[in-house]
Regions:
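Alpha/beta-hydrolase-fold enzymes
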Residues: 2-88
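Catalytic active-site module of serine/aspartate enzymes centered on a nucleophile-bearing elbow/loop
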Residues: 148-188
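Non-catalytic cap/lid and distal C-terminal segments of serine-dependent acyl enzymes
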Residues: 19-20, 108-109, 179-183
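Active-site nucleophile elbow and catalytic-triad environment of alpha/beta-hydrolase enzymes
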Residues: 93-115
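Short, proline-enriched alpha-helix->beta-strand connector loops that line the catalytic pocket
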Residues: 117-123, 150-153
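Short beta-strand/loop motif that positions the catalytic acidic residue
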Residues: 125-127
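Conserved alpha/beta-hydrolase "acid-adjacent" motif
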Residues: 132-142
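Acidic beta-to-alpha connecting loop that harbors the catalytic carboxylate
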Residues: 129-132, 163-164
Length: 188
């Protein structure tokens, strides 16, 4: 959502920090939109599909010990346990919510939309190297290169070794917060 915001309102910003961003294969997004459209037609837009919830996050936990279904979020087990026990964290989106998510992801991954981001907007990309959302750092590096190729002048990237998706809740979060504070101090 932050990347979509940059494409629409980037000229109103002083800088942007993208945390835990990623990308999905176009075919995956097309399939997701199609399935959500079909389910929405039969079940309604407010229906919550366990199938779409599970397939949307399928594989995210594959590289980690299977203690819970959300261990991909962070190495900090107390955070994962808190997340799993909180009703506002573990709900699935409605069909409309997933369809909108797939549409936004499709939009932000088009090269012509990268070009809508102001070239003078400072952007700092941070992510965990073990984050499946960012394809274990490779997706984040690809987005970084796309931003550079689109002409963004002040862009930097930092990948945190052994960190997963929620780097602001990781065991080394103090380092992450210090890096963010340093970037802000140098750009604002």
């Amino acid at each position: 959502m932050a990347r979509r915001y940059l494409m629409t309102y980037g000229d109103e910003l002083t800088g942007a920090i993208l945390c835990g961003t990623g990308e999905q294969a176009s075919a995956t997004l097309f399939a997701g939109k199609t399935v959500a459209g079909i389910l929405g037609a039969f079940k309604g837009q407010r229906y919550r599909s366990e199938f779409i919830r599970k397939t949307s996050f399928k594989g995210y936990n594959d590289r980690f010990e299977k203690r819970t279904e959300n261990d991909w979020l962070t190495k900090d087990q107390s955070i994962v346990d808190w997340y799993n026990g909180h009703k506002f964290c573990t709900f699935g989106f409605t069909i409309n919510g997933y369809k909108t998510l797939f549409e936004v992801l499709t939009y932000i991954q088009k090269q012509e939309n990268y070009n809508k981001i102001p070239k003078n907007l400072p952007v700092y990309m941070i992510a965990g190297e073990d984050d499946p959302v960012g394809n274990y750092g490779e997706g984040v590096k690809h987005i970084y290169q796309q931003y550079k190729d689109s002409g963004i002048k002040d862009i930097s990237i930092k990948l945190y070794p052994n960190d997963r998706h929620e780097i602001l809740n990781e065991l080394d979060k103090e380092t992450v917060y210090a890096d963010v504070a340093d970037w802000i101090a140098g750009h604002m």
